[in-house]
Design a protein with these regions (language model features):
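FNR/FR-type flavoprotein reductase catalytic core
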Residues: 2-24, 113-262
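Ferredoxin-reductase
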Residues: 14-126, 179
């Protein structure tokens, strides 16, 4: 009996170690280009290794090459990260991948908050190398036929865009984007909605409009739909409360907060 228990524990250990090794493995990527879309908003294009894949809506740890230490004591508006206890800037952040593997490149949509990491990221030139590891996703669907209702605020659209591109035409999808000036994927999503009968895409200027869109979906689908929320933490929290107050079960709500966006 003891031998069996030890064997089972050994198998569990090997599986756990394998998962950690797989998720934590690092790959070196090259910068293709960096677009300054407006003011502090940037779209970063990275090369995609042929053997690299990920789930739509995934995030990953992006590590920059060794750089000079910053003297500014500021925080990162997207990740919320600050200096470590020794006063040094961390050179890695968790960022959402705004593209799918079949697009042939890795897209990162982010604000330049003024932190050393974000300023360095925004100033990267073509050919510069970064490291990516720990690919993961908190947005997933259990049923391949259920309706998907999405809310994204600000750069939270980065998490929702690849999901829409993967699933458009395969199920009914409703997307409300509280864009706050982040319109980089707007034309693309409008075009998808125009040619896809079961895709509704709305851009909203305030939270009340987004609530109205979601309320219409709640009245129609109730708990027969899955609700994805992504973006500014305060917005995500408010929308999560709004869904629950209107009878949506917590198990049907999945979220991805961009910590630090205020």
């Amino acid at each position: 009996m003891l031998i069996i228990i030890i064997s089972i524990l050994g198998v569990i250990f090997l599986i756990t170690w394998g998962v950690i090794t797989y998720l934590g493995r690092s790959q070196t990527l090259s910068v293709k280009s960096v677009e300054n879309l407006n003011k502090d908003l940037y779209l970063i294009h990275l090369t995609k290794p042929d053997n690299m894949t990920w789930k739509s809506g995934s995030f990953a740890k992006i590590e920059l090459a060794d750089t000079k230490e910053s003297q500014q004591n500021v925080s990162d508006t997207v990740s919320g990260a600050t200096r470590n206890s020794k006063g040094k800037e961390q050179k890695s952040r968790w960022l959402t991948i705004a593209s799918n593997p079949d697009e042939g490149e890795i897209l990162i949509l982010t604000h330049n908050s003024g932190s050393f990491y974000k300023k360095t990221l925004a100033d990267l030139t073509a050919g510069t190398e970064v490291k990516m590891s720990w690919l993961d996703s908190g947005l997933s669907l259990a049923d391949d036929k259920e309706v998907l209702v999405c809310f994204a605020s600000d750069v939270g659209i980065a998490a929702i865009r690849p999901i829409i591109k993967e699933l458009e035409g395969k199920r009914e999808i409703i997307l409300s984007h509280l864009d706050k000036g982040v319109t980089v994927f707007n034309e693309e999503l409008i075009e998808l909605a125009n040619k896809t009968t079961n895709l509704i895409y709305k851009t909203d200027t305030d939270l009340s409009q987004s609530k109205e869109t979601l309320k219409n979906a709640i009245d129609k689908y109730e708990n027969k739909a899955t609700y994805f929320l992504a973006g500014q933490p305060d917005d995500v929290k408010l929308m999560k409360t709004f869904l629950k107050d209107n009878g949506i079960d917590s198990k049907n709500i999945k979220s991805s907060s961009f910590r630090g966006l205020k």
